């Protein structure tokens, strides 16, 4: 039976990638892509796509989507880049919008599966984190002042509470799968989308504009603390995981997975070698000051919002063992 897939965040990096991959499958009839941004030329070229331009926090999309009877909901949308001076608006978009997505998934009879993209950030980057400790799904998230980590933690809590409430009422609920990805990378992320990210900056791929020129200058070396480390997952692996969770019968009602390879992480010397640069050793206080300075002087155009400096300064590594099994 052909599936109808509803992707929230259909104009984003992951959402558009999944839209493309689903459109190539014979067992998919329709992909409904929702995003607050306009549909890209690439997305317009894809078959089977119904595009709805709306913010997930709005009340304008639910009836339109419901009439297509989606059986799988994949929530990839997020305003990741912090909005300077607009924290309440951002919270409404992200947390409030996610609540509406969850409410739709639990109240629409056709929905059989809900896949939610969460984050590694909500494990919290702290001074006492160690390279040797890999956070597992069972440890759960920790409180953090970094707005992205805080919002994602609250949204996961809301999702689980919504699930528990529905189960207690004896309602039929979709199978829920939460994925917490490492940093997603690959050729699509590097070249098909304009992304203001760590790899783009270090590789010198940011083009045009005074802000991008400043960032490129600042990353002529790889500035790194002793605790700097990253985990990456290839976009093809993300796609394969989502396809597996979408099309195969899974033996759970609600489950959470770190999606990260069971392999060595990328340390600062590794990153420097990969981008052909040298490491510039710095202290955490230097990162904190730089992040504060550029956040306020550029009014958020350089994405260094409060508390995000800790994720550049201290290790945060996940275990991928649960998924590997």
Regions found by a protein language model. Give the residues of each.
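NAD(P)-dependent short-chain dehydrogenase/reductase
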Residues: 163-229, 235
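Conserved glycine-rich Rossmann-like NAD(P)H-binding loop of the short-chain dehydrogenase/reductase
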Residues: 27-38
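Conserved Rossmann-fold NAD(P)-dependent oxidoreductase catalytic core, especially the SDR/UDP-sugar
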Residues: 99-150
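Mid/C-terminal beta-alpha module of Rossmann-like enzyme folds, strongest
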Residues: 229, 237-304, 320
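Catalytic helix-loop patch of NAD(P)-dependent Rossmann-fold dehydrogenases
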Residues: 128-179, 183, 200
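NAD(P)H-binding glycine-rich loop region in Rossmannoid oxidoreductase-like domains
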Residues: 54-96, 125
